[in-house]
């Protein structure tokens, strides 16, 4: 379909797994966030998740909730998110950009306008954590018109029937939430349980599956990369961006990416 599929094909040829990096626009301020985004892109990010701040981020843990709050206090609007995407797209023409947004802003701005502007400014697809696949038909129809990829979320509790539904809704990739609850860096992850679920996904779905929620270290990336198509890292990166530790951010991304090379 586009940049996302191309990226997974390229990684497969290189025998690597995808590093999906998430950061929030406008946290701790717009300029620092732009530097942070550039830093993660320069140091090994394969797919970028661009966080759009929202007042009620139900799926997010404490670190990312703070980022939402601060970005909103900084007055970050859709225009700022688009400006950031457009700026990054000029410098990084081949890296897929996913907009991570709750449904309310899409609805408020208008599905048509939201999709059209996103596409114009270099966005490749959306992750909408509070929009289940069975309620996404209307949005997906508009996204299709603008060649935008819908990335649905699956949970540890997803049944086989649900996994099939998630797979059908996905255009180019699926996102498996590794643990129940909210996002956030964790010391230990239940690898065996995650592996079992990812294997179930693979059996029922032919699209790449990336694993997120809790991934923060090289060993997490290596372990999960041994059975999934990639890992999503958010809270650990957002925390460093919030502390304006831009160099540390680049180093963490390099380290995580090392864990995803065979």
From Swiss-Prot:
One of its GO terms (cellular component) is cytosol. One of its GO terms (biological process) is L-tryptophan biosynthetic process. SUPFAM superfamilies: Ribulose-phoshate binding barrel. GO terms for molecular function: tryptophan synthase activity. It is an enzyme of class 4 (lyase). Pathway: Amino-acid biosynthesis; L-tryptophan biosynthesis; L-tryptophan from chorismate: step 5/5. It catalyses: (1S,2R)-1-C-(indol-3-yl)glycerol 3-phosphate + L-serine = D-glyceraldehyde 3-phosphate + L-tryptophan + H2O. The active site is at residues 49, 60. InterPro entries: Aldolase_TIM (IPR013785), RibuloseP-bd_barrel (IPR011060), Trp_synthase_alpha_AS (IPR018204), Trp_synthase_suA (IPR002028). Its EC number is 4.2.1.20. Coiled coil: none annotated. It comes from the Bacteria. CDD domains: Tryptophan_synthase_alpha (cd04724). Belongs to the TrpA family. The alpha subunit is responsible for the aldol cleavage of indoleglycerol phosphate to indole and glyceraldehyde 3-phosphate. Tetramer of two alpha and two beta chains. This is Tryptophan synthase alpha chain.
